[in-house]
């Protein structure tokens, strides 16, 4: 049965942890979906993972649509959420509506995700949800703000913690169906999780969130530089390199293709 935003909200009520991973193409999406995750996020992290950029900022709306289309073709059960890329929704409400509309109309994603919970962003979320667009929020460390906030942990001071709490609450009140809490203290994440009636999805935010998300490339060992809070379950980087080296050796020593006789 297909996971929906309502499914995730029911999971919070029953204390069932929500499993989320990213995907950027058909092959990864198909495998992640087969493994039984609840949510597949087509994150703008594909800018680094799939396109080789240093951060998420350069990825375009066209690229996000292209990759989301590929991911959706590989998914049968998980909820697919697509990130809105940098400066494709922050300028105005009309821009946000246009961007979200393109993603939902040109792909088969079921929801979008955007960053920030300040008053203008909460207004954007409220407008989108009123138009029928399911929105996942994102507070704490917001990678699209790398040039102003950096990649440091957020919420360490009382002022910062209050801001993150207020933003999460504002997103819920605006109609978001879930919110990502990134790289904040575990105690702060627990406080937010207890205050909200919508699910919290943590990444580098401790174990007291309603669910967890990782960048799949970090999990598989494909990232050149994974964040300190990521856990690597497989060293696919070395496995792929070794397989390619073995193939190269076989070709150069004429062991491949095998001799099939005359």
From Swiss-Prot:
The keyword Ubl conjugation does not apply. Homodecamer; pentamer of dimers. The gene is panB. Binds 1 Mg(2+) ion per subunit. Keywords: Cytoplasm, Magnesium, Metal-binding, Pantothenate biosynthesis, Transferase. It is an enzyme of class 2 (transferase). It comes from Picosynechococcus sp. (strain ATCC 27264 / PCC 7002 / PR-6). It holds the Pfam family Pantoate_transf. HAMAP family: PanB (MF_00156). One of its GO terms (biological process) is pantothenate biosynthetic process. GO terms for molecular function: 3-methyl-2-oxobutanoate hydroxymethyltransferase activity; magnesium ion binding. This is 3-methyl-2-oxobutanoate hydroxymethyltransferase. Its cofactor is Mg(2+). The keyword Transferase applies. GO terms for cellular component: cytoplasm. It catalyses: 3-methyl-2-oxobutanoate + (6R)-5,10-methylene-5,6,7,8-tetrahydrofolate + H2O = 2-dehydropantoate + (6S)-5,6,7,8-tetrahydrofolate. Pathway: Cofactor biosynthesis; (R)-pantothenate biosynthesis; (R)-pantoate from 3-methyl-2-oxobutanoate: step 1/2. InterPro entries: Pantoate_hydroxy_MeTrfase, Pyrv/PenolPyrv_kinase-like_dom, Pyrv_kinase-like_dom_sf. It comes from the Bacteria. Mg(2+) binds at residues 44, 83, 115. CDD domains: KPHMT-like.
